[in-house]
C-alpha cells in the first residue's frame, strides 16, 4: 500500500506540471476530474465534487471519449450514495491497458459525455493506438492484446470460433485487410479472395467483423455467434446490450453480452436472424458497424458457401 501511495503521489506531482503545460488546450471553463488508479476494479466512483457539472441530473449512461476519437458507452449507477461508472467501464480499462498508478483526467463536455486523458505513473500520456493504413484506407484498431491473452485465444475450442476445417490451402484470417475474424479462423484460397473483394466493395469506415457459420451459430442451444475480444473491446464497449442487425431492408434486435472469456456473444434474436436469412454451415457473415450515436446498428453482408 505504501508503494502504491508513493506512486500515486509521484503521478500527482507530475500532473501539476502537465496541467500547466500539456493540458492548456484541454482546459476550458469546465471543471476537470483527476482520478488516480489505486486498485483495479470493474467500476469507478465519480467524486461528488465533479457531479455539479451534470446540473443535478445524473444520466443513466455516459460516453467516455478518448483523444483518438474512440467512444465507450458506460452505465451509471448509484451505490451507497455514490455515483459509479459500472457496466462498460471494464471494457474501457481493458482497451487502454490501465494499470495501478495510472492517472485519469475527465472533462465534462456536455450531453452526457466525458473527454478523457490518461497518464502513466511517470506522467507520460497514454494514447490508444492510432489508425493504421490497411490497403490504402485507415481503420481504428484495438489496443494490442497481451501475450497471455493471445495464449488463451489459442487454447479455445476451434468450433466455438467460427472456423472452417483447415485444408491444404488454408489461409490465416488476418491476411484479409480491413476485416477482423476470430483467432485461428482458416479460409480456403477461394474464400479469402471472395472475402477481400467483398470487404473492398463494402468500403466501411471501420473494420468489419467476419464470422464463419458453424454448429453453434446454426444449430446450437443456445444459438450464438461469438464476437472476438479484439473487436468487442473497441467497437462494442458494453457488457450487455442490444445490437440491431440489418439485411436487405429488414432489421432484427439481437442481444449481445459479455462472456467469461471477455469476448461477446450474440444470443437472443440471433436464431431468428439466422433462420429468416436461411444461413447454413460455412456461410460467412460480415458485420459492418454503422455510425449511430443512439444505438449499435450493423449491416450484415452474407457470403454463401458454394
UniProtKB/Swiss-Prot annotation:
Q: Does the keyword DNA-binding apply?
A: yes
Q: Name one Pfam family in it.
A: B3
Does the keyword Cytoplasm feature in the UniProt annotation? Answer: no
Which CDD domains does this entry report, sorted A to Z? B3_DNA
Annotated GO MF terms:
DNA binding
Which parts of this chain does the entry mark as a DNA-binding region? 29-122, 210-306
Any one Gene Ontology cellular component term annotated for this protein: nucleus
Major localisation: nucleus
The domain of life is Eukaryota
Q: Where is this region: Disordered?
A: 139-166
Keywords on record: DNA-binding, Nucleus, Repeat, Transcription, Transcription regulation
Report the protein name in the record: Putative B3 domain-containing protein Os03g0621600
This protein's species is Oryza sativa subsp. japonica
Amino acid at each position: 500500500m505504501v508503494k502504491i501511495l508513493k506512486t500515486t503521489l509521484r503521478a500527482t506531482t507530475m500532473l501539476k506540471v502537465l496541467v500547466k503545460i500539456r493540458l492548456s488546450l484541454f482546459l476550458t471553463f469546465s471543471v476537470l476530474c483527476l482520478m488516480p488508479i489505486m486498485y483495479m476494479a470493474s467500476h469507478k466512483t465519480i467524486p461528488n465534487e465533479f457531479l455539479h457539472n451534470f446540473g443535478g441530473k445524473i444520466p443513466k449512461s455516459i460516453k467516455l471519449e478518448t483523444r483518438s476519437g474512440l467512444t465507450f458507452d458506460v452505465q451509471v449507477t448509484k451505490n451507497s450514495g455514490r455515483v459509479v461508472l459500472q457496466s462498460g467501464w471494464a471494457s474501457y480499462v481493458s482497451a487502454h491497458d490501465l494499470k495501478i498508478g495510472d492517472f485519469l483526467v475527465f472533462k465534462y463536455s456536455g450531453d452526457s459525455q466525458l473527454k478523457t486523458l490518461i497518464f502513466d505513473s511517470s506522467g507520460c500520456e497514454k494514447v490508444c493506438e492510432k489508425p493504421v493504413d490497411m490497403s490504402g484506407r485507415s481503420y481504428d484498431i484495438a489496443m494490442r492484446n497481451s501475450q497471455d491473452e493471445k495464449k488463451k485465444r489459442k487454447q479455445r475450442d476451434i468450433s466455438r470460433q467460427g472456423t472452417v476445417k483447415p485444408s491444404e490451402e488454408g489461409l490465416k484470417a488476418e491476411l484479409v485487410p480491413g476485416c477482423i475474424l476470430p483467432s485461428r479462423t482458416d479460409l480456403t484460397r477461394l474464400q479469402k479472395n471472395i472475402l477481400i473483394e467483398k470487404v473492398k466493395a463494402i468500403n466501411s469506415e471501420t473494420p468489419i467483423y467476419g464470422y464463419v457459420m458453424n454448429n453453434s451459430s446454426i444449430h446450437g442451444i443456445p444459438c450464438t455467434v461469438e464476437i472476438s475480444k479484439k473487436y468487442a473491446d473497441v467497437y462494442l464497449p458494453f457488457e450487455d446490450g442490444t445490437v440491431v442487425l440489418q439485411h436487405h431492408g429488414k432489421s432484427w434486435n439481437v442481444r449481445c453480452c459479455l462472456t467469461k472469456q471477455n469476448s461477446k456473444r450474440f444470443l437472443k434474436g440471433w436464431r431468428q436472424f439466422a433462420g429468416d436469412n436461411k444461413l447454413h454451415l460455412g456461410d460467412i457473415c460480415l458485420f459492418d458497424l454503422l455510425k449511430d450515436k443512439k444505438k449499435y446498428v450493423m449491416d450484415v453482408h452474407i457470403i454463401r458457401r458454394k
